Regions:
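N-acyltransferase acceptor-side catalytic subdomain
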Residues: 1-214
Length: 214
Protein backbone atom coordinates (compact mmCIF):
# COMPACT_ATOMS: atom_id res chain seq x y z
CA UNK A 1 0.00 0.00 0.00
CA UNK A 2 2.73 2.49 0.96
CA UNK A 3 4.85 1.73 -2.11
CA UNK A 4 1.77 2.09 -4.32
CA UNK A 5 0.94 5.45 -2.72
CA UNK A 6 4.43 6.80 -3.44
CA UNK A 7 4.14 5.61 -7.04
CA UNK A 8 0.98 7.73 -7.28
CA UNK A 9 2.67 10.80 -5.80
CA UNK A 10 1.20 10.46 -2.30
CA UNK A 11 3.20 10.21 0.93
CA UNK A 12 2.38 9.79 4.66
CA UNK A 13 2.89 12.35 7.42
CA UNK A 14 1.75 12.34 11.04
CA UNK A 15 0.40 15.50 12.72
CA UNK A 16 2.98 15.00 15.50
CA UNK A 17 5.58 12.44 16.54
CA UNK A 18 3.31 11.09 19.28
CA UNK A 19 0.14 11.03 17.19
CA UNK A 20 -1.54 7.71 16.33
CA UNK A 21 -2.85 9.26 13.09
CA UNK A 22 -1.22 9.30 9.65
CA UNK A 23 -2.35 11.66 6.89
CA UNK A 24 -1.77 11.00 3.19
CA UNK A 25 -0.41 14.08 1.45
CA UNK A 26 -0.29 15.13 -2.22
CA UNK A 27 0.88 18.78 -2.36
CA UNK A 28 -0.32 21.05 -5.16
CA UNK A 29 3.30 22.19 -5.53
CA UNK A 30 6.09 19.66 -5.10
CA UNK A 31 9.69 20.25 -4.07
CA UNK A 32 12.34 18.43 -6.10
CA UNK A 33 16.13 18.52 -6.32
CA UNK A 34 17.20 18.31 -9.98
CA UNK A 35 20.05 15.80 -10.02
CA UNK A 36 21.78 17.45 -12.97
CA UNK A 37 21.74 20.89 -11.33
CA UNK A 38 22.58 20.10 -7.72
CA UNK A 39 24.50 23.00 -6.17
CA UNK A 40 27.24 22.40 -3.59
CA UNK A 41 27.78 25.53 -1.43
CA UNK A 42 31.39 26.68 -1.00
CA UNK A 43 31.83 25.61 2.64
CA UNK A 44 30.34 22.19 1.97
CA UNK A 45 32.58 21.85 -1.07
CA UNK A 46 35.65 22.34 1.14
CA UNK A 47 34.34 19.90 3.73
CA UNK A 48 33.68 17.18 1.15
CA UNK A 49 37.22 17.50 -0.17
CA UNK A 50 38.66 16.97 3.31
CA UNK A 51 37.15 13.46 3.68
CA UNK A 52 36.92 13.80 7.46
CA UNK A 53 33.89 11.54 7.80
CA UNK A 54 33.12 7.92 6.99
CA UNK A 55 30.11 7.39 4.74
CA UNK A 56 27.95 4.30 5.18
CA UNK A 57 24.64 3.22 3.68
CA UNK A 58 22.01 1.09 5.41
CA UNK A 59 24.25 0.14 8.34
CA UNK A 60 21.85 1.36 11.05
CA UNK A 61 18.49 2.28 9.56
CA UNK A 62 16.64 2.35 12.87
CA UNK A 63 19.15 4.72 14.47
CA UNK A 64 18.78 7.13 11.54
CA UNK A 65 14.98 7.21 11.56
CA UNK A 66 14.92 7.52 15.36
CA UNK A 67 17.30 10.50 15.15
CA UNK A 68 15.17 12.09 12.42
CA UNK A 69 12.06 11.68 14.59
CA UNK A 70 13.51 13.48 17.61
CA UNK A 71 12.81 17.18 18.25
CA UNK A 72 15.70 19.52 17.49
CA UNK A 73 16.47 23.22 18.07
CA UNK A 74 13.98 25.29 16.14
CA UNK A 75 11.88 22.21 15.38
CA UNK A 76 10.23 21.07 18.62
CA UNK A 77 7.87 18.73 16.76
CA UNK A 78 8.34 16.22 13.95
CA UNK A 79 5.95 14.29 11.70
CA UNK A 80 7.55 10.85 12.15
CA UNK A 81 5.35 8.84 14.50
CA UNK A 82 5.67 5.17 15.56
CA UNK A 83 3.54 3.95 12.63
CA UNK A 84 5.78 5.67 10.08
CA UNK A 85 8.91 4.36 11.80
CA UNK A 86 7.53 0.83 11.77
CA UNK A 87 6.50 0.94 8.10
CA UNK A 88 9.83 2.36 6.95
CA UNK A 89 11.79 -0.22 8.92
CA UNK A 90 9.73 -2.85 7.09
CA UNK A 91 10.42 -1.13 3.76
CA UNK A 92 14.12 -1.15 4.60
CA UNK A 93 14.01 -4.86 5.38
CA UNK A 94 12.34 -5.37 1.99
CA UNK A 95 15.10 -3.44 0.23
CA UNK A 96 13.06 -0.35 -0.66
CA UNK A 97 14.15 2.17 1.99
CA UNK A 98 17.73 3.29 2.43
CA UNK A 99 19.96 5.48 4.55
CA UNK A 100 23.05 7.52 3.85
CA UNK A 101 24.96 7.86 7.12
CA UNK A 102 27.83 10.10 8.19
CA UNK A 103 30.06 8.60 10.88
CA UNK A 104 32.86 10.24 12.85
CA UNK A 105 35.11 8.41 15.28
CA UNK A 106 32.67 5.51 15.53
CA UNK A 107 29.61 7.66 16.16
CA UNK A 108 26.66 8.45 13.92
CA UNK A 109 27.05 12.18 13.24
CA UNK A 110 24.24 12.69 10.75
CA UNK A 111 22.30 11.12 7.95
CA UNK A 112 19.11 10.80 5.98
CA UNK A 113 16.66 8.16 4.87
CA UNK A 114 14.30 7.74 1.96
CA UNK A 115 12.54 5.38 -0.41
CA UNK A 116 13.85 4.17 -3.78
CA UNK A 117 11.39 3.10 -6.48
CA UNK A 118 12.64 2.59 -10.01
CA UNK A 119 14.60 5.73 -10.86
CA UNK A 120 12.88 7.86 -8.21
CA UNK A 121 14.22 8.52 -4.73
CA UNK A 122 11.88 10.05 -2.17
CA UNK A 123 13.88 11.88 0.47
CA UNK A 124 12.05 11.67 3.78
CA UNK A 125 14.08 13.33 6.52
CA UNK A 126 17.61 14.07 7.67
CA UNK A 127 19.38 14.99 10.88
CA UNK A 128 22.72 16.34 12.03
CA UNK A 129 24.68 15.98 15.27
CA UNK A 130 27.79 17.64 13.82
CA UNK A 131 28.40 20.66 11.61
CA UNK A 132 27.22 20.02 8.03
CA UNK A 133 26.74 16.28 8.64
CA UNK A 134 23.27 16.16 7.06
CA UNK A 135 24.53 18.24 4.12
CA UNK A 136 27.38 15.77 3.61
CA UNK A 137 24.84 12.94 3.60
CA UNK A 138 22.73 14.77 1.02
CA UNK A 139 25.72 15.35 -1.26
CA UNK A 140 26.70 11.68 -1.06
CA UNK A 141 23.09 10.68 -1.75
CA UNK A 142 23.01 12.82 -4.90
CA UNK A 143 26.37 11.44 -6.03
CA UNK A 144 25.03 7.89 -5.63
CA UNK A 145 21.76 8.65 -7.39
CA UNK A 146 23.59 10.19 -10.33
CA UNK A 147 25.89 7.17 -10.54
CA UNK A 148 22.91 4.80 -10.32
CA UNK A 149 21.05 6.58 -13.16
CA UNK A 150 18.20 7.89 -11.03
CA UNK A 151 15.95 10.45 -12.67
CA UNK A 152 14.15 12.12 -9.76
CA UNK A 153 14.97 13.21 -6.21
CA UNK A 154 11.69 14.12 -4.52
CA UNK A 155 12.07 16.56 -1.62
CA UNK A 156 8.30 16.72 -0.96
CA UNK A 157 8.23 20.41 0.03
CA UNK A 158 10.43 23.31 -1.02
CA UNK A 159 12.28 24.82 1.95
CA UNK A 160 14.80 27.61 2.28
CA UNK A 161 17.32 25.05 3.49
CA UNK A 162 16.96 22.96 0.33
CA UNK A 163 16.99 25.95 -1.98
CA UNK A 164 20.70 26.44 -1.30
CA UNK A 165 21.26 23.11 -3.08
CA UNK A 166 19.18 24.07 -6.10
CA UNK A 167 15.79 22.72 -5.04
CA UNK A 168 12.82 23.96 -7.05
CA UNK A 169 9.05 23.69 -6.90
CA UNK A 170 6.90 22.21 -9.67
CA UNK A 171 3.11 21.90 -10.06
CA UNK A 172 1.60 18.53 -9.20
CA UNK A 173 0.80 17.69 -12.84
CA UNK A 174 4.41 18.30 -13.90
CA UNK A 175 5.66 16.32 -10.92
CA UNK A 176 3.51 13.32 -11.82
CA UNK A 177 4.93 13.37 -15.35
CA UNK A 178 8.48 13.41 -13.96
CA UNK A 179 7.56 10.67 -11.50
CA UNK A 180 6.11 8.44 -14.21
CA UNK A 181 9.28 8.78 -16.29
CA UNK A 182 11.46 8.06 -13.27
CA UNK A 183 9.53 4.97 -12.22
CA UNK A 184 10.11 3.44 -15.64
CA UNK A 185 13.86 4.07 -15.49
CA UNK A 186 16.35 1.27 -14.90
CA UNK A 187 18.26 2.53 -11.86
CA UNK A 188 20.39 1.06 -9.09
CA UNK A 189 20.80 2.37 -5.54
CA UNK A 190 24.45 1.88 -4.69
CA UNK A 191 25.06 1.16 -1.02
CA UNK A 192 28.67 0.45 -0.18
CA UNK A 193 31.04 1.85 -2.79
CA UNK A 194 34.78 1.14 -2.93
CA UNK A 195 36.74 4.18 -1.68
CA UNK A 196 37.98 5.06 -5.16
CA UNK A 197 34.44 4.97 -6.59
CA UNK A 198 33.14 7.01 -3.65
CA UNK A 199 35.79 9.67 -4.30
CA UNK A 200 35.11 9.61 -8.03
CA UNK A 201 31.37 10.05 -7.51
CA UNK A 202 31.91 13.07 -5.25
CA UNK A 203 34.51 14.55 -7.62
CA UNK A 204 32.04 14.26 -10.49
CA UNK A 205 29.37 15.96 -8.40
CA UNK A 206 31.69 18.82 -7.43
CA UNK A 207 32.77 19.29 -11.04
CA UNK A 208 29.17 19.34 -12.26
CA UNK A 209 28.17 21.76 -9.52
CA UNK A 210 31.06 24.10 -10.34
CA UNK A 211 30.27 24.01 -14.07
CA UNK A 212 26.60 24.70 -13.49
CA UNK A 213 27.39 27.55 -11.09
CA UNK A 214 29.68 29.24 -13.60
Amino acid sequence: MVVRAYALGIFPMAPARGSPTVHWVAPAMRGILPLDRFHVPSRLRRTLRQHRYEIRCDSDFRAVIEACARPRPGHPETWINPAIKRVFCELHAAGHAHTVEVWHEGRLAGGLYGLALGGAFFGESMFSHATDASKIALAHLVARLRRGRFRLLDAQFLTEHLQQFGAIEVPSADYLTLLGEALRADAIFYGALPPDEESAAISELLTQSSTHRS
